[in-house]
């Protein structure tokens, strides 16, 4: 068995196990010597905890960064993006330019968001500026649409506060932290239904930042036609695209799973909105993903034993502006349809080809820069070393004349060096 990768996983999914077995890798237990561990976020917390005192050797790699939650917890993601904006502002970067109303021209890509209970007073102040607005509340550490609800009255928050057995939002209680975000109430609709994008982004290293976009993302549609009517605020089949919720709807389609490929979306938008604005939209999606990664890179523990495949959730509004909603550390590997199973099998296959070159025993000291021919359906989204090597002022894109962000960017390598674009 010498020379064969020994693998462990605590996530029993066929798309994972079939990929390991296809490579002739050998399954072992976590108590034996292993080279590759595809683990849950709970396990990664234990592996890297001070109490455990576990040290990974050079021939071991895992699929999460130790403090991935700086990006994948809703509250910390927003906190880091806000800090990133302030730092760019302090530097005088053109990226931090604002309009006459004080809104960021280029960095306004997450909905207005507050942390509860900490930011309750700030939220109330903002709410009173637009009392007819709708807000969406989400628990910071949950996924699959659990614990989410919409509100359009302060009294609803106060009632929730009482129901949560907390005496006051102003006091720091031990209750579960929530974020409350301005709800995008003008989403782009197709067939009258709301949808979002699930995009896969692989990060092999944060310093230098090197990330890849998977070309086979998809759209997730709601089963019930969208209405901003306040009478439907409680109907999650109208508002939340999560498959975990939509699959319980009467109109859920088990054949296509309420999903479209990103390529189908692109074709639809090119035919209804035009090729130029569609290209601009996808450039902007690239832009906000790179900026979100740049925002967390300084605080991320760039452990050489780690890589991570994130699930990015993006909503497009009716003006074709993309919004970053959240980033998932463990995007679902459950297959809801036959096409879903093929997509996720190929996603894992391509991820492993990049993370474990040639399927050989890992060496965490390698430069994490695989040859282009092994990328499969991934394409380089951003490579900090290449960007710096070519000069921070140069825009590396295959479609000239379509800048994203300020044209005069000179500070802090703006992150506009998108190496490839959606095909």
Curated annotation (Swiss-Prot):
Its keywords, alphabetically, are: ATP-binding, Cell projection, Cilium, Cytoplasm, Cytoskeleton, Flagellum, Ligase, Magnesium, Metal-binding, Microtubule, Nucleotide-binding
Record-annotated residues binding Mg(2+) 2? 326, 328
UniProt keyword annotation of Nucleotide-binding present: yes
One Gene Ontology cellular component annotation?
microtubule
Q: Which cofactor does it need?
A: Mg(2+)
Q: At which positions is ATP bound?
A: 138, 144-145, 181-184, 194-196, 241-242
Q: Where in the cell is it found?
A: Cytoplasm, Cytoskeleton; Cytoplasm, Cytoskeleton, Cilium basal body; Cytoplasm, Cytoskeleton, Cilium axoneme; Cell projection, Cilium, Flagellum
Molecular function (GO) terms listed?
ATP binding; metal ion binding; protein-glutamic acid ligase activity, elongating; tubulin binding; tubulin-glutamic acid ligase activity
The protein's matches in SUPFAM superfamilies, at most eight in alphabetical order, are given as: Glutathione synthetase ATP-binding domain-like
| Superkingdom of origin | Eukaryota
**How does the annotation summarize its subunit structure?**
Part of the neuronal tubulin polyglutamylase complex which contains TPGS1, TPGS2, TTLL1, LRRC49 and NICN1. Interacts with PCM1, CSTPP1 and LRRC49.
What is this protein's function per UniProt? Answer: Catalytic subunit of a polyglutamylase complex which modifies tubulin, generating side chains of glutamate on the gamma-carboxyl group of specific glutamate residues within the C-terminal tail of tubulin. Probably involved in the side-chain elongation step of the polyglutamylation reaction rather than the initiation step. Modifies both alpha- and beta-tubulins with a preference for the alpha-tail.
Protein known as: Polyglutamylase complex subunit TTLL1
* Species name: Rattus norvegicus (Rat)
Annotated gene: Ttll1
């Amino acid at each position: 068995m010498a020379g064969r990768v020994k693998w462990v996983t605590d996530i029993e999914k066929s798309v994972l196990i079939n990929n390991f077995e296809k490579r002739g890798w050998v399954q072992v237990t976590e108590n034996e010597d292993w080279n590759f561990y595809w683990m849950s976020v709970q396990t990664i917390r234990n592996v890297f905890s001070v109490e455990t005192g576990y040290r990974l050797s050079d021939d071991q790699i895992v699929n999460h960064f130790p403090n991935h939650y700086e990006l994948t917890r809703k509250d910390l993601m927003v906190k880091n993006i806000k800090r990133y904006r302030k730092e760019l502002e302090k530097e005088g970067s053109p990226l931090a330019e604002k309009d006459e109303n004080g809104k960021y021209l280029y960095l306004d890509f997450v909905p207005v968001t507050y942390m509860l209970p900490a930011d309750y007073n700030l939220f109330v102040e903002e709410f009173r500026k637009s009392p007819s607005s709708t807000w969406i509340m989400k628990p910071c550490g949950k996924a699959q649409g659990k614990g989410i609800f919409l509100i359009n009255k302060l009294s609803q928050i106060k009632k929730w506060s009482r129901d949560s057995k907390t005496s006051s939002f102003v006091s720091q209680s031990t209750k579960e932290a929530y974020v409350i975000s301005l709800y995008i109430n003008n989403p782009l609709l197709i067939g009258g239904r709301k949808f979002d994008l699930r995009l896969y982004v692989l990060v092999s290293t944060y310093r230098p930042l090197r990330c890849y976009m998977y070309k086979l993302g998809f759209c997730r549609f709601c089963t019930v036609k969208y209405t901003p009517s306040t009478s439907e605020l409680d109907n999650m089949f109208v508002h939340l695209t999560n498959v975990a919720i939509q699959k319980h709807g009467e109109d859920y389609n088990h054949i296509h799973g309420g999903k479209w490929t990103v390529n189908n979306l692109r074709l639809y938008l090119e035919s209804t909105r035009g090729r130029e604005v569609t290209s601009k939209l996808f450039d902007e999606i690239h832009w906000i993903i790179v900026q979100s990664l740049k925002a967390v890179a300084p605080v991320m523990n760039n452990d050489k034993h780690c890589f991570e495949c994130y699930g990015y959730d993006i909503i497009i509004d009716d003006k074709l502006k993309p919004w970053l909603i959240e980033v998932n550390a463990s995007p679902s590997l459950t297959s809801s349809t036959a096409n879903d199973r093929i997509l996720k099998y190929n996603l894992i296959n391509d991820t492993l080809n990049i993370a474990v070159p040639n399927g050989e025993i890992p060496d965490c000291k390698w430069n994490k820069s695989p040859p282009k021919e092994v990328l499969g359906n991934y394409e380089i989204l951003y490579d900090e070393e290449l960007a710096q090597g070519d000069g921070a002022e140069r825009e590396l894109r295959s479609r000239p004349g379509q800048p994203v962000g300020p044209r005069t960017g000179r500070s802090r390598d703006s992150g506009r060096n998108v190496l490839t674009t959606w095909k």
